């Protein structure tokens, strides 16, 4: 009986809190609608810290999220970005479990920010770091997917590709690359767009996405004739490579790399990627030098990381973030 009464009182208290937040939110909205942006912004900040000090983390986060959206709708991007940072602060301090809804909310705020603002860079960095509480060492793959799609819509293909590589969305990555290649690339390099992506996915030990991005890209690109076999030697190489990775036979991998050396020389990074793929999937030992030298080595080390544990599941990242060239 006492427990039931306590639960009932708790429900009433929760309802009162929600009602109080809604009333406050209504007043703040009215202030913004009148154009009192500075006053409203300061009031949002005051309420945030008050709620946080009272351990009302959910109320604080929801109020900042709705406030950020409100400021964005009135083209007050600086105030909106500031409240967006407070949303992250509430997540960080409360140690909230990563959920798809929260990731969608963060991606929504990201999509509304000025693409060229330093606030956006800081926001995405903190959001990815917070999301590591879920899956993936370098940010939740789902958040990477949401970010990649936003950047793709903005035609920022360079950064979109980076985030797709750290997602599990091989199909989305392929569709973006088709658009990227068709709008920005040379016809003679139509094969190189997907070859780089496949090799990088494999270096991240994501066989599934590597296969999906290759199949989707070669089927949908208007300048690629249906295969296999393909007109472009590099595409045939990748097709054979994906089969070899599934088989795991070192002799097949070695002969394949030897036979396609003329085509692989089109990009000096290809053989560096293949060295790593040989270690991950075919049991090859690392090179004698513990790290690769020169500019290419810096790029590869940033892609692969150093001294990491190779015993990971397909699709789980075991490297540092990729530097894309």
Swiss-Prot record:
Region (Disordered): 1-22, 306-325
Any Gene Ontology biological process: protein insertion into ER membrane
Keywords: Cytoplasm, Transport
Ranges of compositional bias, category Acidic residues: 307-317
Location (main, coarse): cytoplasm
Taxonomic superkingdom: Eukaryota
Gene Ontology cellular-component annotations: BAT3 complex; cytosol
Location(s) in or outside the cell: Cytoplasm, Cytosol
Subunit structure: Component of the bag6/bat3 complex.
Function: As part of a cytosolic protein quality control complex, the bag6/bat3 complex, maintains misfolded and hydrophobic patches-containing proteins in a soluble state and participates in their proper delivery to the endoplasmic reticulum or alternatively can promote their sorting to the proteasome where they undergo degradation. The bag6/bat3 complex is involved in the post-translational delivery of tail-anchored/type II transmembrane proteins to the endoplasmic reticulum membrane.
Protein family: Belongs to the GET4 family.
Name listed for the protein in its UniProt record: Golgi to ER traffic protein 4 homolog B
Organism: Xenopus laevis (African clawed frog)
């Amino acid at each position: 009986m006492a427990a039931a009464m306590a639960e009932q009182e708790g429900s009433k208290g929760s309802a009162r809190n929600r009602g109080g937040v809604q009333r406050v939110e209504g007043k703040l909205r009215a202030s913004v609608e009148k154009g009192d942006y500075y006053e409203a912004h300061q009031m949002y900040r005051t309420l945030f810290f008050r709620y946080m000090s009272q351990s009302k983390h959910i109320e604080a986060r929801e109020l900042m999220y709705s406030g950020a959206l409100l400021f964005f709708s009135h083209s007050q991007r600086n105030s909106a970005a500031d409240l967006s940072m407070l949303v992250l602060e509430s997540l960080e301090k409360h140690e909230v479990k990563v959920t798809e809804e929260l990731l969608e909310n963060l991606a929504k705020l990201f999509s509304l920010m000025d693409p060229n603002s330093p606030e956006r860079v800081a926001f995405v960095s903190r959001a990815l770091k917070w999301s590591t509480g879920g899956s993936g060492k370098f940010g939740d793959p789902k958040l990477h997917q949401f970010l990649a799609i936003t950047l793709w819509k903005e035609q920022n293909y360079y950064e979109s590709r980076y985030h797709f590589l750290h997602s599990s969305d091989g199909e989305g990555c392929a569709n973006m690359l088709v658009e990227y290649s068709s709008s920005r690339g040379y016809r003679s390099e139509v094969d190189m767009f997907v070859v780089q992506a496949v090799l990088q996915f494999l270096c991240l030990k994501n066989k599934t996405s590597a296969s999906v991005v290759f199949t989707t890209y070669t089927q949908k690109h208007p300048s690629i004739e249906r295969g296999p076999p393909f007109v472009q030697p590099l595409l045939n190489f990748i097709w054979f490579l994906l089969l070899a990775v599934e088989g795991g036979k070192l002799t097949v991998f070695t002969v394949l790399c030897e036979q396609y050396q003329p085509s692989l020389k089109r990009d000096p990074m290809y053989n560096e990627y293949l060295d790593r793929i040989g270690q991950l999937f075919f049991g090859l030992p690392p090179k004698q030098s513990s790290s690769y030298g020169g500019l290419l080595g810096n790029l590869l080390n940033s892609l692969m990381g150093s001294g990491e544990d190779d015993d990971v599941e397909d699709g789980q990242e075991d490297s540092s973030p990729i530097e894309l060239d």
